[in-house]
């Protein structure tokens, strides 16, 4: 039987076995999982993409043609 895939915990770098019974994967622990969640909530992480436009209000839009 082959050995399970081992990856690094994205938070602390500890080795983590990539197995279906590891409820924290890809993290090594609940603590590392919550640290990562907090970083997303604090907007320390972002998914790259196009810059969002400023809020546009309906009064700023040209009238629609019927």
Swiss-Prot record:
What GO annotations for molecular function exist for this entry? DNA topoisomerase type II (double strand cut, ATP-hydrolyzing) inhibitor activity; zinc ion binding
InterPro entries, per this entry? DNA_gyrase_inhibitor_YacG, Znf_NHR/GATA
UniProt cofactor note = Binds 1 zinc ion.
Could you say which residues bind Zn(2+) here? Answer: 9, 12, 28, 32
Q: Which domain of life is it from?
A: Bacteria
Q: Which cofactor does it need?
A: Zn(2+)
Parts of the chain that traverse the membrane? none
Q: Does the keyword Metal-binding apply?
A: yes
GO BP terms:
regulation of DNA-templated transcription
Q: Which Pfam families match?
A: YacG
Q: Which UniProt keywords apply?
A: Metal-binding, Zinc
Which PANTHER family did the record assign? DNA GYRASE INHIBITOR YACG
What the record says about family reads:
Belongs to the DNA gyrase inhibitor YacG family.
Provide the assembly information: Interacts with GyrB.
What does the record give as the function of this protein?
A: Inhibits all the catalytic activities of DNA gyrase by preventing its interaction with DNA. Acts by binding directly to the C-terminal domain of GyrB, which probably disrupts DNA binding by the gyrase.
Protein's recorded name: DNA gyrase inhibitor YacG
Gene behind this protein: yacG
């Amino acid at each position: 039987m082959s050995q399970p895939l081992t990856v690094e915990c994205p938070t602390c770098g500890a080795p983590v076995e990539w197995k279906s019974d590891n409820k924290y994967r890809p993290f090594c622990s609940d603590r590392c999982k919550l640290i990562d969640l907090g970083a997303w909530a604090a907007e320390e992480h972002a998914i790259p993409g196009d810059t969002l436009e400023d809020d546009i209000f309906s009064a700023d839009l040209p009238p629609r043609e019927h």
